[in-house]
């Protein structure tokens, strides 16, 4: 997410981290690099200038607090100021499990509202609540079908009018009646602009009808600074906007501009879309977000993701590993778990030291290797999976042919298995593998070509 911005900011801070001596000249040079990175991400020039002055003042005038070196203190100053730029505090979606809640999604056409409705339903579902969806957009021909496909994928009830003959208000009224058994109703409304008075009037009518607990404005992250005007316009026309959901941050060069622009008008950003899948919606936490951008990691989110995909088979696999059993069967289960966690680039950005320094091809190569490793193991017999040491020349040839790969790739898999087994062995003995040691070796083997 925001790869170029993260890389540029990390490069700037590395000048501080790698310097023998930090003086005023170096501080100014680093600040110039930070300015350039933020402006390229479409952050408002005035905001960047004000933030830069504050970083320079603190870096030059303030003495590092006890326990921090001068370098660490400057990195923390930059981190704190970037967090401030994005709104500082985390705004959570508050839902009362004892009462039915209603969420109204609004935004212009093309902002990713319909996909966000399904993502939000999935997010709520993972919190243990029962969501339901209402497809109230009758103006865009594919809106109902799109939401229907997504709702079926996540097993969430949907109410809508496939014929598009009913009004959004009538659909919403009927939907509220039909979805009595759910805990949270999410309404996907039609895309609109501030000039469309009839649509705005319709939206206000739906607001009065549903009395929503929260109105969420969905904004396209590729808009950059323009997001400010859009958020402002909707805030003026619908005064009760509860929060903002910013989409398409995974591939946007202007994502930083969009986030800072929305934060500037004090509209709380509660969610960000980080990919196309229904699970790619995150609660927005400025501190965690900046940590990942700067390559400092986000272990809390990584643990949350791990908990989300834990099932009985995963737990059995972990139990086997902790008892000292680690065969290719356990390795396969671990690769399955990693695959379920989401895009590899996103996962790696949560590991301290990996985010901003991640080579461009590394994440894709990692995903490709994981897939190939699984294909290779699918070509093995149960005996071979349980006893990898049996895989010698003749078996290597057969497995390689069955998987459609070279024998060297099977050897690469067995090497990865051996490294991982040793790392888990150390974990069992109470030793934590470090990124520079065996854990680093595991990641490097996945990320780089031999």
Curated annotation (Swiss-Prot):
Main EC class the enzyme belongs to: hydrolase
Enzymatic reactions: GTP + H2O = GDP + phosphate + H(+)
SMART domains per record: AAA, SRP54, SRP54_N
Protein localization: Cytoplasm
Documented EC number(s): 3.6.5.4
Key words of the record: Cytoplasm, GTP-binding, Hydrolase, Nucleotide-binding, Ribonucleoprotein, RNA-binding, Signal recognition particle
CDD domains attached to this UniProt entry: SRP54_G (cd17875)
Highest taxon above the source species: Archaea
Keyword Cytoplasm: yes
Alphabetical GO biological process terms: SRP-dependent cotranslational protein targeting to membrane
GO molecular function, one term: GTPase activity
An annotated GO cellular component: signal recognition particle
UniProt KW Ribonucleoprotein keyword: yes
Pfam family, one: SRP_SPB
Binding-site positions, GTP: 107-114, 188-192, 247-250
Subunit structure: Part of the signal recognition particle protein translocation system, which is composed of SRP and FtsY. Archaeal SRP consists of a 7S RNA molecule of 300 nucleotides and two protein subunits: SRP54 and SRP19.
Domain topic, free-text comment: Composed of three domains: the N-terminal N domain, which is responsible for interactions with the ribosome, the central G domain, which binds GTP, and the C-terminal M domain, which binds the RNA and the signal sequence of the RNC.
Protein family (similarity comment): Belongs to the GTP-binding SRP family. SRP54 subfamily.
Function: Involved in targeting and insertion of nascent membrane proteins into the cytoplasmic membrane. Binds to the hydrophobic signal sequence of the ribosome-nascent chain (RNC) as it emerges from the ribosomes. The SRP-RNC complex is then targeted to the cytoplasmic membrane where it interacts with the SRP receptor FtsY.
Protein's name according to its UniProt entry: Signal recognition particle 54 kDa protein
Organism per entry: Methanococcus maripaludis (strain C5 / ATCC BAA-1333)
